[in-house]
């Protein structure tokens, strides 16, 4: 159950890169359209804070516009009082950047549409590992790619049948891939992000799925994490109704 909870938490907090392809690779490698501007190894930026603006710096980027009364109540935070979404969006990267940098070092896009990443399974691990065959991409144009994750690879080490079925069901929602926008903030930077049009259906799916999950068999730690996640997810549809613009993504550097 932990892997399922972590997967949903990642979607809820970062809202990016949670989709998959069918088991077969549909890319025609001989006719692969390249975008040389994104090829190569891109590093996750160090987490920090701008000394002038006091805003968090790093690779996690969240942008939001919407109603001033949009708020979220997070159990155990802000005395369980509603917290304005605009404030949550501006402060969340301060936490997320540190978390991301501790487990993800870099991402490589090669000229054949394959993606690999250097990562740690846990932040306190000593050794970095390389993840291959989890993801591929197709170039739409200079400002858009379609990202595919390998469902079989993602779920191959899940022993619990119920958990595996849940994750597979979630991933099956996105067989056509993720439309990922690409921009170039500087010569040595690239910004990959998804927008509200992609996030909104994910939230609707999460809302449905999370309210179907039985808590039978969860240990105390899993149950506490799940209940917090469920409380957050159940507020997201209302928040999206009050959202006019949302972007979530990664700004990587060479």
Regions found by a protein language model. Give the residues of each.
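Bacterial N-terminal signal peptides that target proteins for export
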Residues: 1-8
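Bacterial Sec-dependent N-terminal signal peptides
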Residues: 4, 13-45, 49, 248-254
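Short, flexible helical or helix-coil boundary motifs
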Residues: 8, 12, 92, 96, ...
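Short, P/G- and charge-enriched loop/turn segments at secondary-structure junctions
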Residues: 28, 93-95, 234-238
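Post-signal-peptide N-terminal segment of Sec-exported extracytoplasmic proteins
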Residues: 41-79, 99, 103
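Contiguous, well-ordered beta-strand patches that form the walls/edges
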Residues: 48, 78-205
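Flexible coil/linker segments and helix-coil junctions enriched in charged and small residues
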Residues: 64-83, 159-169, 208-235
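Edge beta-strand at a domain terminus
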Residues: 134-139, 200-254
């Amino acid at each position: 159950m932990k892997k399922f909870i972590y997967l949903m938490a990642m979607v809820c907090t970062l809202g990016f890169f949670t989709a998959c392809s069918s088991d077969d690779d549909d890319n025609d490698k001989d006719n692969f359209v390249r975008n040389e501007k994104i090829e190569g190894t891109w590093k996750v930026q160090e987490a920090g804070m701008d000394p002038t603006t006091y805003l968090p710096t790093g690779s996690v980027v969240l942008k939001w516009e919407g109603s001033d009364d949009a708020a979220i109540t997070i159990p155990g935070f802000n005395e369980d009082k509603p917290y304005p979404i605009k404030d949550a969006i501006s402060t969340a990267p301060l936490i997320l950047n540190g978390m991301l940098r501790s487990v993800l070092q870099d991402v490589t896009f090669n000229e054949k549409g394959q993606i690999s990443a250097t990562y740690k399974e846990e932040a306190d691990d000593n050794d970095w590992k390389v993840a291959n065959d989890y993801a591929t991409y197709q170039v739409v144009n200079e400002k858009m790619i379609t990202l595919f994750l390998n469902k079989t690879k993602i779920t191959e080490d899940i022993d619990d049948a119920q958990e595996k079925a849940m994750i597979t069901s979630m991933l099956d929602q996105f067989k056509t891939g993720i439309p990922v926008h690409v921009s170039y903030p500087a010569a040595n930077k690239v910004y990959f992000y998804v927008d509200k049009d992609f996030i909104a259906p994910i939230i609707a799916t999460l809302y449905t799925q999370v309210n179907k999950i039985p808590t039978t068999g969860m240990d105390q730690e899993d149950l506490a994490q799940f209940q917090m996640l469920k409380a957050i997810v159940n507020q997201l549809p209302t928040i999206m109704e009050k959202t006019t613009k949302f972007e979530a993504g990664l700004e990587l550097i060479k």
